[in-house]
């Protein structure tokens, strides 16, 4: 489990491609690798990956074919930086919201507005996922817990503060790029439950 508070952006220094998976080698800081062990879970752009090897602050992850297809890790190249968060430790402050590291879908960057007053990103997603995305609600964006701005039938707006831009890789994204999306699980459960109840009542009334 994760909090959506990105700890660092780290460079992908190599990608070894094999049948059915890619092995990512990510350069981390000594602070991030302190106490990290093989088998631990680390979020890379919001995707929960298992550590397979640690070598001189280089951390290795095996990324399965399905994960490559369903997330933007499939478009990641050597030299790119990914958002990194280690697993949640109970007893410490939680500043974001609980994320599982299981990406639901990808959003396409529709527009970027960077002015002296603001930095806004407009995202477009499949309309079925907009049932779970609400104005002022939370959503995981490349593993970063963010508040939703204006919403439409096909997407939503993000209003990013300088601190978020400094600590994450979101400033690197341009129109047409793909960003990993994890919706809030509690919101999904509530919406799905209400829809089932309403559908059942409608069926009984017919």
What are the language-model segments listed below?
Residues 1-206:
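Conserved loop->alpha-helix
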């Amino acid at each position: 489990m994760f909090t959506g508070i990105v700890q660092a952006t780290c460079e992908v220094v190599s990608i070894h491609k094999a049948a059915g998976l890619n092995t990512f080698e990510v350069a981390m800081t000594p602070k991030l690798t302190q106490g990290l062990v093989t088998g631990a879970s680390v979020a890379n752009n919001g995707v929960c990956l298992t550590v397979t090897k640690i070598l001189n602050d280089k951390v290795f992850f095996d990324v399965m074919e399905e994960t490559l297809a369903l997330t933007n890790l499939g478009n990641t190249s050597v030299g790119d930086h990914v958002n990194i968060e280690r697993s949640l430790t109970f007893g410490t402050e939680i500043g974001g919201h609980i994320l599982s590291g299981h990406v639901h879908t990808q959003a396409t960057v529709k527009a970027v507005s960077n002015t002296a007053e603001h930095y806004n990103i407009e995202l477009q997603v499949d309309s079925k996922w907009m049932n779970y995305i609400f104005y002022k609600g939370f959503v995981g964006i490349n593993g970063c817990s963010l508040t939703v701005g204006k919403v439409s039938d096909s997407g939503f707006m993000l209003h990013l503060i300088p601190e978020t831009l400094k600590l994450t890789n979101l400033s690197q994204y341009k129109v047409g790029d793909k960003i990993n999306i994890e919706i809030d699980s509690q919101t999904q459960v509530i919406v799905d439950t209400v829809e089932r109840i309403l559908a059942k009542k409608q069926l009984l009334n017919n």
